[in-house]
């Protein structure tokens, strides 16, 4: 298969123009089809990397260490003016259906069924929106019904793997489960758009009896409870196990590696946190940097797996974030509010450029 055509197909699903690409894809031969890894980072700003996406390195580019992002960039394309929606659910619903968010109308965070997450206003009457997310089947109110490009991949012979954050549909709706969208394997994906904690010492948000103490508790990682393994690393290990199994199926794979990092809470990844303190970052900023480098290590581990298994030359890797970087949470970031994506204004949740500009790259 033409790899440039397929990467266009996957990228087009973000913009809602995937129909023609789907038709071309279905007409291709089934021999030597490339694997696909879509590596999604949560809340990663355009400067949250040592790789500059501007004409010069910024202060944040100098502060962070992301050698595997640099490694990926050497092998592929960089998109220096990449944009997403300003919040995760809108971007992710567009991704899975190929529909622009102005059409699917998932315009705020989704979580609980039939409950809006809009702030109440005494002066503005807010319009109705699809707060139950998206689905492939009719029957749920305030839901956009669309076709999953993952299901199309599965139907054409791909082994499909979801690992990490989903955030496609509200709790107790069909769309909350990645299996509904054509993923044959679901690792830790559910309705929530965040996480309770990255820490295995807190069982990723579960009590000792196994019950979640938060709607944001990460499911499916029970084998790592109490082991000291950070959530980012646990997800990476499970993804690699799934790839090891996929090798035996004699079919191409699609891995959606959808990290919860670098979403709040900004827990310290102790594999990297001390290094950033020594570099002079504050405790909050060092913790933030540790999440970034932990995610970068995950990217490197997956690339190493491809090299080890002779799949690197037959795998498309697409790297992106779901919205702009965090810039309005003084509990988690130091510095003046709305400046963490400077010279762009504001960040996640805002319609200023800091809220919608993200990092994009692809290895074809």
Mark where each language-model region is.
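Substrate-binding rim/cap in mid-to-C-terminal beta-strand-loop elements of soluble/periplasmic
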Residues: 75, 96, 194-198, 300-308, ...
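Metal-dependent active-site segment of extracytoplasmic phospho-/sulfohydrolases and closely related
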Residues: 251-253, 258-259, 294-332
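Active-site segment of extracytoplasmic enzymes that catalyze sulfate/phosphate-ester chemistry
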Residues: 21, 38-39, 46-147, 152, ...
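Bacterial N-terminal signal peptides that target proteins for export
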Residues: 1-7
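Short, solvent-exposed turn/loop segments enriched in Gly/Ser/Thr/Pro and often Arg
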Residues: 53, 76-99, 107-114, 162-174, ...
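Bacterial N-terminal signal peptides
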Residues: 8-16
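Loop/turn elements at helix/coil->beta-strand transitions in domains of secreted/extracellular proteins
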Residues: 32-37, 75-80, 155-161, 181-184, ...
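Formylglycine-dependent
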Residues: 111-159, 166-253, 259-268, 282-283, ...
């Amino acid at each position: 298969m033409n790899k440039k055509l397929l990467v266009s197909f996957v990228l087009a699903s973000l913009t809602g123009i995937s129909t023609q690409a789907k038709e071309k894809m279905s007409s291709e031969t089934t021999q030597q089809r490339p694997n696909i890894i879509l590596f999604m980072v949560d809340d990663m700003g355009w400067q949250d990397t040592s790789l500059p996406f501007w004409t010069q390195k910024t202060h944040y580019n100098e502060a962070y260490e992301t050698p595997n992002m640099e490694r990926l960039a050497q092998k592929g394309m960089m998109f220096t003016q990449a944009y997403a929606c300003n919040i995760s659910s809108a971007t992710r619903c567009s991704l899975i259906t190929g529909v622009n968010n102005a059409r699917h109308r998932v315009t705020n965070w989704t979580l609980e069924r039939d409950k809006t997450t809009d702030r109440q206003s005494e002066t503005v009457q807010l319009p109705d929106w699809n707060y139950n997310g998206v689905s492939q089947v009719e029957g749920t109110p305030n839901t956009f019904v669309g076709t999953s490009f993952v299901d199309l991949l599965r139907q054409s012979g791909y082994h499909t793997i979801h690992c990490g954050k989903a955030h496609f549909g509200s709790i107790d709706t069909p769309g909350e489960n990645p299996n509904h969208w054509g993923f044959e394997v679901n690792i830790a994906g559910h309705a929530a758009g965040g996480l309770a904690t990255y820490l295995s010492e807190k069982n990723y948000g579960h009590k000792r009896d196994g019950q979640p103490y938060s709607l944001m508790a990460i499911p499916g990682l029970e084998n790592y409870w109490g082991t000291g393994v950070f959530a980012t690393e646990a997800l990476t290990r499970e993804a690699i196990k799934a790839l090891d199994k996929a090798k035996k199926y004699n079919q191409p794979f699609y891995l959606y590696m959808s990290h919860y990092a670098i979403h709040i809470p900004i827990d310290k990844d102790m594999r990297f946190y001390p290094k950033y303190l020594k570099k002079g970052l504050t405790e909050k900023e060092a913790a933030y940097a540790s999440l970034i480098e932990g995610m970068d290590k995950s990217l490197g581990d997956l690339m190493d797996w491809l090299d080890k298994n002779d799949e690197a030359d037959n795998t498309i890797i697409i790297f992106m974030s779901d919205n702009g970087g965090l810039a309005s949470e003084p509990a988690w970031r130091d510095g003046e509010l709305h400046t963490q994506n400077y010279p762009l204004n504001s960040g996640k949740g805002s319609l200023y450029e800091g809220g919608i500009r993200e990092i994009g790259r692809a290895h074809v």
